[in-house]
Amino acid sequence: MSGAELISDLRARFGQAVLSEQSTNDAFPTLWIAPDAAPAVHRYLKHDVAKPFALLADLWAIDETARKHREGQPPSGITIASHLISLGRNADIVLKCPLDAKAPRATSIASVYPNADWYEREAFDLFGVHFDGRHDHRRILLPPLWEGHPLRKDQPARATEKPPFVMTAARFDAEEKALMIDPEALGLPTERDGVELMILNYGPHSMATHGVFRVVLALDGEEIVAARPDIGFHHRGAEKMGERQSWHQFIPYTDRIDYLGGVISEMPYLQAVERLCGITVPDRAKTIRIMLSEIYRIMNHLLLYGTMAQDCGAMSPVFYMFTDRERGYRIIEAITGARMHPGWFRIGGVAADLPEGWDRLVREFLDWMPKRLDDYAGMVLGNEIFRGRTVGIAAYDTATALDWGITGPGLRATGCDWDLRKARPYGGYENFEFEVPTGNNGDCYDRVLVRVEEMRQSLRIIRQCLDHMPSGPIKADHPLTTPPPRERMLHDIDTLIHHFVGVSWGPVVPAGEATGQAETVRGLTQYALVSDGATCSYRTRIRTPSFAHLQAVSAIAPGLTVADLVAYLGSIDYVMSDVDR
């Protein structure tokens, strides 16, 4: 069934509840539906349609009140959008519901897609959208006593636009009291079989939480009866920043969403911008992007490998692996001039060509790593203590993973081979040969094993980049390429002015909507951008894998021990900046 056939099917089944189809820059359909029909439409797409849309990739809101270009869309003050993916069809669909701006109310779909829970809380927190059918409208990223909903267009983007912040003694006491654990508000049981449960605040300063994040646990002895993750400590308004920075200036911010992923996190953002602009990236730039992305994938997975061993009691591996990571960073430094956050991709290409001697550094790295991975297999994967701490621990199947929005290695560990680089190749990946590693049991051990095998496949991809690096330009010959190639600006005053305006104010991107998706180090990272024909984004929606993966803790942790939880959290491989944005 094609996208057009699916829309015809939905129109026939739901009649006037299907309001209209919206034209976007994406290849998949976007459909407006009545808010009260949302649960029924989502339920049909998940359970009843052939090759169902089992994955709710994202759910977000858009404040339409200041938008100028809404041609072909129904009236809406606040829009709720949900992005669904069918792995069987390898297809997507976006459903939108128009809401009132003053008192936005939608209908919850958490009973259909369990992972909608946190996304709906986020839409309430940042936009003030109330969801009928929900019992929990607590904030999720902001403090409980925060006033207002900051992603609304009437809310300032800078602290200098607000009155000075003053923390009085009374306010300090109120804020501290609001953060106290209330088991009833969290939905935590306080007893089981007549036995009182211990409520344990795990984090946010525990080394095992790998960042500023806490889990509130209800314990019966060492057994976890219930778990409630608490996030938001690292929130810094990245999506709001996307509305005030130019399209070009926002690139460095994408590195800091997942601060261990480096340039790999720039890929989905630039895909969306380039789709809006109609830019085709040259082959040499594509190959350079892929090579650097795969180096960063190895850097990340080595860190996970070492710290996971450390969480399970082995100290030595992480120090050996930092030596390997340093070799990778030598390549990154030589090419980009930076290490963790290069901000090096550009709209239409990359910042500069490869330096002299890059191939020698890459070849040395490729010759070095396979033997090291062989050594670590015996040191970690074959270690009896490590296996005892990870085999059979925190296991889940593919259906559970999809219910909770788990992608990347966490999904592939269940035996599902869905990888965007293979399923829907982007940015030149269609030109490379590599395998998609999978596990069998979906446990902590398999999640580590999949990442280890992914490193070997990344080495394979990098070697193909080394052996078959195309010649040619590193930036697209397009008016909106930013900054434009120097040869476009040195001819006359007109080209010089175009360069000056494009760099100082930023390129004016045509009005429209576009989505960029990438298989980043943790899973599906997605940018849904709305342009209103200006020098900056009207709405920058960032879908991160870590946000979805941490939400699943509440479903998977019960039945584990506290020691098991340490291994489980380590195997998720989340980054708190990726969660909180």
From Swiss-Prot:
Protein's cellular compartments: Cell inner membrane
**In which domain of life is the source organism classified?**
Bacteria
* GO cellular component labels: NADH dehydrogenase complex; plasma membrane
Q: How does it assemble?
A: NDH-1 is composed of 13 different subunits. Subunits NuoB, CD, E, F, and G constitute the peripheral sector of the complex.
The main location is membrane
Q: Which Gene3D superfamilies did the record assign?
A: Cytochrome-c3 Hydrogenase, chain B, NADH:ubiquinone oxidoreductase, 30kDa subunit
User: What gene name does this entry carry?
Assistant: nuoC
Q: How does it sit in the membrane?
A: Peripheral membrane protein
* Name recorded for this polypeptide: NADH-quinone oxidoreductase subunit C/D
Cell membrane recorded as keyword: yes
Note the InterPro entries from the entry.
NADH_DH_suCD (IPR023062), NADH_Q_OxRdtase_suD (IPR001135), NADH_quin_OxRdtase_su_C/D-like (IPR037232), NADH_UbQ_OxRdtase_30kDa_su (IPR001268), NADH_UbQ_OxRdtase_49kDa_CS (IPR014029), NDH1_su_D/H (IPR022885), NiFe-Hase_large (IPR029014)
The answer to whether the entry has keyword Transmembrane is: no
Enzyme class label: translocase
User: Of which family is this protein a member?
Assistant: In the N-terminal section; belongs to the complex I 30 kDa subunit family. In the C-terminal section; belongs to the complex I 49 kDa subunit family.
> What job does the chain carry out?
NDH-1 shuttles electrons from NADH, via FMN and iron-sulfur (Fe-S) centers, to quinones in the respiratory chain. The immediate electron acceptor for the enzyme in this species is believed to be ubiquinone. Couples the redox reaction to proton translocation (for every two electrons transferred, four hydrogen ions are translocated across the cytoplasmic membrane), and thus conserves the redox energy in a proton gradient.
Q: Which Enzyme Commission numbers does its entry carry? A: 7.1.1.-
Q: Which UniProt keywords apply?
A: Cell inner membrane, Cell membrane, Membrane, Multifunctional enzyme, NAD, Quinone, Translocase, Transport, Ubiquinone
**Reactions it catalyzes:** a quinone + NADH + 5 H(+)(in) = a quinol + NAD(+) + 4 H(+)(out)
